[in-house]
C-alpha cells in the first residue's frame, strides 16, 4: 500500500501518511465534558500508525453536547484535559485535530439557553423542543465556536475541524430540509451557507492564517428534501473562498422516520448500511475536491486497504478515513500500510458501536471487547 504511505501537507501541518482516524463519538468523557483516562487510552491505541487523528465532536457550549459524555471546549477548565489528549496523540507521531460542534436540535437534553438550537424549528427528538434561533443567538453561537477553537489551539491541537455535517447545528442550516428561514440565513444553497461561513470567518480571525481549519460537510443527504451534491459543490467552493484548508466529506447514508405521540421525527445516520459497497461516497468526494480545489478526506467503509489505495490512486483523494474498522481493530491502519490487510480483525458492521451510544451508553463493540464500553456492558 505504498501510495497510502505518502506524506500530506495541510496549511503547514505534516501528516506522515494518508490514513486518518475520523471523529467517532464515544461517550467516554465525563459529565462535565472533561477528558478521562478511557479517552486517553482509546485514542493512544489508535494513534500509532495513522497520519491524522480527528478527535470526536467537542461541544462549543454545554447545551450543544451530542451525548452526556461528549467532550467539551466551552470553558477554560476543559483545556488541561484536552492538552493531555493532544499530547498523547502527537507523541505517537500522528497529527492531532479536534472537531468542534454544536448538536443543535439533536442535542442531549441537559438544559441551557440554546438547548435545541435550530434554524427554523425542525425537531429531531421528542425530548428536545427545537429553538428557532434569533439573529442575536446566531451571533453568540459564532463567538462560541471561535472561543472553542481558541481553546483547542491553546491545548496544543494542530488544527480544528468545524462540524458541518450529520444534521447537527451547522448542517441544519445548510440543509433545505431543516432550514426554512426567510432572512439572510435561509434560501438557496449560498444563503443557507451564511451561518457556516460566518463561523469559519470568526474561527479564522481568532486563530490566524497559519492554523489549519478543516470542515466536515455532507456530500448528500439521503432523505427527501435533503442537501444534494449540487448544493455541496456550491458550499464547498464558498468554504474554500472563506479560508478553509481541507474538507472532510461525509453524508447522510440512510434515514427513516419514527412517530412519537403523533409527531414524526427524522432518524438519520452517516453509517453505510451493510449492503452498501465500500467507497460509495468517494466519487462525490472527488467531485467536491475538483469544485473547491482543496485537500479532501474520504470516508465510507474504507477499512479494506485495497479500496482506500484505489481511492487515492484512481481519484484525486488526499486522505482516507478509516472509522469503524479502527474501533474493531486499533492496529488496522498499521496492517494496511504494511500490506498485511488479511490480518485485520474485521468489523462485521453489526452497528453495536452506534447502538450503544444511541442508548446513552459508552460506545461498545461486539468484535473488540477491550473497549471501555464493551467492558462495562459485558
Task: For the regions a language model picked out, list residue spans one by one.
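Flavin-dependent oxidoreductase catalytic cores
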Residues: 1-378
Amino acid at each position: 500500500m505504498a501510495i497510502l504511505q505518502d506524506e500530506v501537507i495541510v496549511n503547514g501541518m505534516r501528516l506522515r501518511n494518508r490514513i486518518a482516524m475520523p471523529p467517532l463519538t464515544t461517550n467516554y468523557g465525563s459529565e462535565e465534558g472533561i477528558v478521562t483516562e478511557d479517552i486517553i487510552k482509546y485514542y493512544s491505541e489508535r494513534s500509532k500508525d495513522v497520519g491524522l487523528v480527528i478527535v470526536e465532536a467537542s461541544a462549543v457550549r454545554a447545551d450543544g453536547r451530542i451525548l452526556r459524555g461528549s467532550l467539551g471546549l466551552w470553558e477554560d477548565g476543559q483545556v488541561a484535559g484536552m492538552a493531555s489528549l493532544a499530547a498523547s496523540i502527537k507523541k505517537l507521531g500522528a497529527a492531532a485535530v479536534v472537531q468542534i460542534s454544536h448538536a443543535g436540535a439533536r442535542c442531549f437534553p441537559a438544559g441551557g439557553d440554546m438547548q435545541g438550537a435550530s434554524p427554523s424549528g425542525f425537531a429531531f427528538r421528542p425530548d428536545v423542543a427545537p429553538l428557532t434561533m434569533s439573529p442575536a443567538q446566531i451571533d453568540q453561537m459564532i463567538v462560541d465556536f471561535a472561543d472553542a477553537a481558541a481553546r483547542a489551539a491553546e491545548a496544543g491541537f494542530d488544527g480544528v475541524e468545524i462540524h458541518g455535517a450529520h444534521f447537527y447545528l451547522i448542517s441544519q442550516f445548510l440543509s433545505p430540509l431543516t432550514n426554512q428561514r426567510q432572512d439572510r440565513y435561509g434560501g438557496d444553497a449560498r444563503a443557507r451557507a451564511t451561518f457556516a461561513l460566518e463561523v469559519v470567518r470568526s474561527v479564522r480571525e481568532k486563530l490566524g492564517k497559519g492554523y489549519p481549519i478543516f470542515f466536515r460537510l455532507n456530500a448528500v443527504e439521503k432523505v427527501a428534501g435533503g442537501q444534494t451534491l449540487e448544493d455541496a459543490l456550491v458550499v464547498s467552493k464558498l468554504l474554500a473562498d472563506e479560508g478553509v484548508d481541507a474538507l472532510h466529506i461525509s453524508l447522510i447514508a440512510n434515514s427513516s422516520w419514527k412517530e412519537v405521540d403523533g409527531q414524526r421525527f427524522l432518524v438519520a445516520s452517516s453509517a453505510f448500511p451493510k449492503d452498501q459497497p465500500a467507497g460509495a461516497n468517494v466519487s462525490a468526494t472527488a467531485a467536491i475536491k475538483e469544485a473547491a480545489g482543496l485537500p479532501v478526506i474520504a470516508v465510507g467503509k474504507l477499512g479494506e486497504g485495497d479500496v482506500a489505495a484505489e481511492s487515492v490512486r484512481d481519484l484525486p483523494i488526499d486522505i482516507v478515513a478509516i472509522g469503524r474498522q479502527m474501533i474493531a481493530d486499533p492496529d488496522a491502519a498499521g496492517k494496511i500500510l504494511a500490506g498485511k490487510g488479511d490480518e485485520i480483525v474485521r468489523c462485521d458492521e453489526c452497528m453495536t458501536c452506534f447502538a450503544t451510544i444511541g442508548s446513552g451508553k459508552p460506545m461498545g463493540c461486539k468484535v473488540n471487547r477491550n473497549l471501555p464500553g464493551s467492558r462495562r456492558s459485558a
